[in-house]
Amino acid sequence: MHALSQEPTVWHGTTILTVRKGGRVVVGGDGQVSIGQTVIKSNARKVRKLGKGDVIGGFAGATADAFTLFERLESKLEQYPGQLTRAAVELAKDWRTDRYLRRLEAMMIVADKEVSLVLTGTGDVLEPEAGVMAIGSGGNYALAAARALIDTDKDAESIVRKSLDIAADICVYTNRNITIEALSAE
């Protein structure tokens, strides 16, 4: 239980979306953090550049867990520079087998100029279909919107922004305080 209500502590939230289009990769996420039915923070930054700025990461789930995973991923990127897929697979192996890491509750989207990936606590490392992937409570809404917009004349950033706005219209755990990071994918 927590002081804000009489329900068990359940962290809800977020929507993270990545779109690859027109030589760019864009990762965006909303800023809402909720416990139960209460919004605790509306401007959390869940998307950021990692390593030397050549990888973008976004997370859904418990914030402390996500930052632990970001740190581990940055360590793997130092071991395997320029090899995001290899670093992600090595992190996923650790995540599955390490007793401490196995308890972490988060999912991550990571992207560099060549590949976008979703990492899960079950050891999955997934590459998106058609350059679009989303995670979090509003992920399915953002994913559907982005897929509908991918073949229009909108650029990757516009697709991410519009899709996250649509997710915020539908998902009560997603807001319009959007953080965007982008890389040239050339």
From Swiss-Prot:
Main localization, broad class: cytoplasm
Gene3D superfamilies for this protein: Glutamine Phosphoribosylpyrophosphate, subunit 1, domain 1
Gene Ontology annotations of biological process type: proteolysis involved in protein catabolic process
InterPro entries, A to Z: ATP-dep_Prtase_HsIV_su, Ntn_hydrolases_N, Proteasome_sua/b, Proteasome_suB-type
Activity modulation notes: Allosterically activated by HslU binding.
Enzyme's top EC category: hydrolase
Coiled coil: none
Record: residues binding Na(+): A168, C171, T174
MF annotations from Gene Ontology: metal ion binding; threonine-type endopeptidase activity
Active site per UniProt: T14
Subcellular location: Cytoplasm
GO CC entries: HslUV protease complex; proteasome core complex
Subunit structure: A double ring-shaped homohexamer of HslV is capped on each side by a ring-shaped HslU homohexamer. The assembly of the HslU/HslV complex is dependent on binding of ATP.
PANTHER family xref list: ATP-DEPENDENT PROTEASE SUBUNIT HSLV, METALLOPROTEASE TLDD
Role description: Protease subunit of a proteasome-like degradation complex believed to be a general protein degrading machinery.
The protein, known as: ATP-dependent protease subunit HslV
Organism, scientific name: Bradyrhizobium sp. (strain ORS 278)
